[in-house]
Amino acid sequence: ACAPIGQRQESGDYRESWQPATFTPDVLEQAQHIARTAVEGLVAKAQASGEKGWGVFGVELFVLTDGNVLFNEVSPRPHDTGMVTMASQRLSEFALHARAILGLPITQEHVALSIPEGTVAASHAIVVQGDGEAEFRNVAAALAEPGTDLRVFAKPEVHGHRRMAVA
């Protein structure tokens, strides 16, 4: 399993995530138990119907202020929250998913954090609003900032609110 990822949403949409997220040992234990139970159940169901059930499973949980953990959803694929793994881990969720569906081994080294100890990696969705052709400005200025990475999704048009990139 990967180190915990925290996230923030606005109006139910992903805005930013960070890894590693810090939780108390009790919260982490609850979260791991819920995630393991959900994924093992889905894999067992897939295998019972002749499927393999391989791949990355993004398990989204809510941690309440009282320390209780609630299940929200499972995505049987890379999840937007996990985009931070492109900056934080030895292998990103995308590379891990490819290895898993190809039946290649995944070790602790593959999911190990690649950032200096005591630091946190973060990603932030770049969301635009409007209608029409996509236009990107100030990319050079953004990339001139040390430690900044930008992933543009190459969506040709904007319709309403749309995630166009992640930094």
Where are these regions (language model features)?
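A short, glycine/Asx- and small/polar-enriched loop/turn
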Residues: L64-L70, H161-R162
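Glycine-rich phosphate/diphosphate-binding loop of Rossmann-like nucleotide-binding domains
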Residues: T24, L28
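Beta-strand scaffold of nucleotide-dependent catalytic cores
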Residues: A1-Q7, E16, V59-E60, V69-S75, ...
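Active-site "cap" helix and flanking loop/linker of ATP-utilizing ligase/carboxylase catalytic domains
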Residues: E29-V59, T65, S75-G132
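A short beta-turn/loop motif at secondary-structure boundaries
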Residues: Q7-R8, F62-V63, S114-E117, E157-H159
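Glycine-rich active-site loop/lid that clamps phosphate-bearing ligands
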Residues: P116, A125-V158
